[in-house]
Regions:
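S-adenosylmethionine
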Residues: 234-312
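Conserved SAM-binding loop of SAM-dependent methyltransferases across substrates and taxa
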Residues: 185-198
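Conserved SAM-binding motif I beta-strand of class I
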Residues: 199-204
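S-adenosyl-L-methionine
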Residues: 208-252
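Non-catalytic substrate-recognition/targeting regions of SAM-dependent transferases
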Residues: 60-73, 89-158, 166
């Protein structure tokens, strides 16, 4: 009916098909636009920027802060700009110029290319300023993490799990044995150890996970040899643990949305319930199961159904309750109009027998 709805751009990209960037008719993507949204994002993170015990977080969260297709992460003064849209990348110079003009204290800039492109752009590169040391040690709630600004798309820590790590440290670590599956660089394990866990066990199929996990313990003054680290398929570890009758007080499960190894293909949408069924027997009586997914195509209600079905399939008579649900922290701003952007779902489940 020819009613104006908003200004948007449409294009092929890693996430989504199109984004509305303004409700103002004829608003241009210019210096004033980007300066405005960056200033608002910066002000909304003032508390984090002033924090002495947290020096890494999401500084600009794409559509949640007014413009989809690009995110900016803060690592103790170094910023990592991730591009999800080739169309948005055409505004690269304008966006970087306004970001550097707005965000105070930037030491160096890195970028990640997360869209398919025909120009063969490197997936990770240093853009300018001062290069970060390797590793760059950042703080999260007082815990140190070794990060790498220019080692592929990942840096060594998933910033969206900050509140989950802190919850595990504060409530589910002291005096407990902790199993961390799909452990990546062992960040959950380090948080648990710093929270007083008597033993942590980290399991990941990637060869790099061993040295990376050892490093995360070491930078916090924890001897890696006092912890257990396995480089093996998580599902094979389940079989090993059941055979050895191993039980853990806290079990953390945070698989990728989709993964393929030589032995199997895993998809959260299809296989998470089976995963829960296999890991439930490893949870000690009155233990805690922490289940996480970043699959945007799985709703919270669907996720809960998968979990409940998996537990019942494994041990139908076992009593349990969901005691806590966590999602994205406030720096990962989510627009009300795009619920799929609110992708992180984490359930804390306590067993009573």
């Amino acid at each position: 009916q020819r009613h104006f709805l908003g200004m948007a751009y449409v294009g092929f990209q890693n996430k989504g098909v199109a984004w509305v960037y303004s409700r103002e008719e004829d608003e241009a993507l210019d210096d004033a636009f980007f300066s405005g949204i960056f200033k608002t994002a910066f002000e909304n993170r003032r508390a984090l920027l002033r924090s002495e015990d947290t020096t890494t977080f999401r500084l600009f969260n794409g559509e949640g802060d007014g413009f989809g297709g690009v995110t900016i992460d803060w690592y103790d003064g170094f910023i990592v700009v991730s591009w999800y849209s080739e169309g948005v990348y055409h505004y690269r110079d304008l966006i970087l110029t306004q970001a550097l003009a707005t965000f105070e204290g930037v030491k160096g800039v890195y970028e990640k290319i997360r869209f398919k492109n025909e120009a063969d752009l490197p997936e990770s590169s240093f853009v300018g300023g001062v290069e970060a040391p390797e590793p760059l040690i950042v703080l999260e709630n007082g815990i140190k993490y070794a990060t790498y600004m220019n080692e592929g798309l990942m840096t060594g820590i998933f910033l969206d799990q900050r509140e989950v790590r802190e919850t595990i440290r504060q409530r589910y670590s002291a005096g407990r044995t902790v199993l961390n599956t799909f452990s990546y660089t062992g960040a959950f394990s380090v948080a648990a150890a710093m929270g007083g866990a008597t033993q942590t066990t980290s399991v990941d199929v990637a060869n790099r996970s061993l040295e990376k996990t050892k490093e995360q313990f070491a930078v916090n003054g924890i001897d890696p040899e006092t912890q257990q680290i396995y480089v093996m398929d998580v599902f094979d570890y389940f079989k090993y643990a059941v055979k050895k009758q191993l039980k853990f007080d806290t079990v953390v499960v945070d698989p990728p949305s989709f993964a393929r190894t030589k032995k199997r293909t895993f998809s959260v949408a299809k296989d998470y319930g089976k995963l829960v069924a296999q890991i439930t027997p490893l949870v000690a009586p009155k233990g805690t199961l922490v289940l996480s997914t970043n699959a945007a195509n799985v709703s919270e209600s669907q996720f809960q159904q998968m979990i409940e079905k998996g537990i019942q399939e494994a041990e139908g008579n076992r009593k349990f309750r969901i005691v806590l649900k966590k999602g994205l922290p406030s720096d990962f701003a989510v627009p009300v109009a795009t619920p799929l952007s609110d992708y992180l779902k984490v359930f804390f489940i306590e067993f009573n027998n």
